[in-house]
């Protein structure tokens, strides 16, 4: 029997697979209705802000040969509507599924409001603090590139909420370990990494960027080596649990992230090619572990053999 069970603060995962925030919306998008979400370790909902946001100008998504460039911009109906109209029915449908809510805001007060309301709702098991979204003009990555800001925000959120918090790190920094340490110093219970890399694609005929927002976040297979490297670097700098993400499309990719130091993973862009990607990866994981002679996935955490 292969053990894929992973226990993290607030998240008791039957397997280490979850959808990256935004991938399955609030559990209400078509892809999330194609299978039982209980087949995954957890559900991560789309980033929630204090008030409704409409996102960035269209087009918001460009599919590239090696990934996806997006500038969606945290579209959501606002925290009160999310709790009432999204999380309440999701929790009713999945009473035992670990749910992580992603927290966003334009300023510190916004982050604190959303975090407290989501925590007090009793509907989620943990919070992911999104200080790394590159597609908003205020908040998001503007918070996540400054260690002192990350530490202070983490500390204030931690003092307000009753559930574990995971800080989502941006790769758009010189040294991601400084941000990781700042989150740890602020009291974070875990880390999520990486968010998307800033990128741009230009249509040579119109001479215009392909995205309405001009610049977007790059995800998918092109970023996987960067994500693996950063997970390793962060693992070397902290003992906090890590949820790794960035270009995962197979069970082998999951194992690679675990070897680099992640405890669990999130799957995002792979769903553009296969709407059931996370389920297929979860189903394949025990088979891949068996091939390697591994009986417990936790045995592989940070077990890369360096040259």
Curated annotation (Swiss-Prot):
Q: Which gene is the coding source of this polypeptide chain?
A: pyrD
The record ties this protein, via InterPro entries, to: Aldolase_TIM (IPR013785), DHO_dehydrogenase (IPR050074), DHOD_1B (IPR033888), Dihydroorotate_DH_1 (IPR024920), Dihydroorotate_DH_1_2 (IPR012135), Dihydroorotate_DH_cat (IPR005720), Dihydroorotate_DH_CS (IPR001295), Dihydroorotate_DH_I (IPR049622)
Query: Which residues does the record give as FMN binding sites?
Result: 21, 46-47, 130, 168, 194, 220, 246-247, 268-269
Q: What is this protein called?
A: Dihydroorotate dehydrogenase A (fumarate)
- Functional note: Catalyzes the conversion of dihydroorotate to orotate with fumarate as the electron acceptor.
Residues at the active site? 133 (nucleophile)
User: Which prosthetic group or cofactor does it need?
Assistant: FMN
Tell me one GO biological process term.
'de novo' pyrimidine nucleobase biosynthetic process
What pathway, per the record? Pyrimidine metabolism; UMP biosynthesis via de novo pathway
Localization per Swiss-Prot or TrEMBL: Cytoplasm
Record keywords, A-Z? Cytoplasm, Flavoprotein, FMN, Oxidoreductase, Pyrimidine biosynthesis
- What's the record's note on cofactor binding? Binds 1 FMN per subunit.
* Listed CDD domains: DHOD_1B_like
Q: How does it assemble?
A: Homodimer.
Give the organism the record lists.
Lactobacillus johnsonii (strain CNCM I-12250 / La1 / NCC 533)
Gene3D superfamilies noted in UniProt? Aldolase class I
Out of the domains of life, which is the source? Bacteria
Q: Give binding positions for substrate.
A: 46, 70-74, 130, 195-196
GO annotation, cellular component aspect:
cytoplasm
- Into which family does the record put it? Belongs to the dihydroorotate dehydrogenase family. Type 1 subfamily.
Q: Which reaction does it catalyse?
A: (S)-dihydroorotate + fumarate = orotate + succinate
């Amino acid at each position: 029997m292969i053990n894929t069970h992973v226990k993290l603060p607030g998240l008791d995962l039957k397997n280490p697979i979850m959808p990256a925030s935004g991938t399955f919306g609030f559990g209400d998008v078509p892809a999330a209705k194609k299978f039982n979400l209980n087949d995954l370790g957890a559900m991560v909902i789309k980033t929630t802000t204090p008030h409704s946001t409409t996102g960035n100008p269209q087009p918001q998504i460009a599919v590239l040969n090696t990934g996806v460039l997006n500038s969606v911009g945290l579209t959501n109906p606002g925290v009160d509507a999310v709790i009432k109209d999204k999380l309440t029915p999701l929790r009713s449908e999945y009473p035992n599924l670990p749910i992580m809510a992603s927290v966003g805001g334009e300023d510190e007060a916004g982050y604190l409001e959303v975090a407290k309301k989501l925590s007090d709702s009793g509907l989620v098991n943990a919070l992911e603090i999104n200080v790394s979204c590159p597609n908003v003009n205020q908040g998001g990555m503007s918070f996540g590139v400054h260690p002192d800001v990350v530490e202070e925000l983490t500390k204030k959120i931690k003092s307000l909420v009753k559930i574990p918090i995971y800080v989502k790190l941006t790769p758009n920094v010189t040294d991601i370990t400084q941000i990781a340490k700042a989150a740890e110093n602020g009291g974070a219970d875990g880390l999520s990494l990486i968010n998307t890399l800033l990128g741009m694609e230009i249509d040579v005929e119109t001479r215009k960027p392909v995205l309405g927002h001009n610049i977007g976040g790059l995800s998918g297979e092109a970023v996987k080596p960067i994500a693996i490297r950063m997970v390793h670097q962060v693992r070397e700098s902290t003992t906090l649990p890590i949820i790794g993400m960035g270009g995962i499309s197979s069970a082998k990719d999951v194992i690679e992230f675990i070897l680099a130091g992640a405890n669990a993973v999130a799957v995002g862009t792979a769903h553009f090619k296969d709407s059931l990607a996370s389920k297929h990866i979860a189903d394949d994981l025990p088979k891949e572990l068996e091939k390697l002679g591994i009986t417990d996935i936790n045995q592989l955490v940070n077990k890369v053999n360096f040259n």
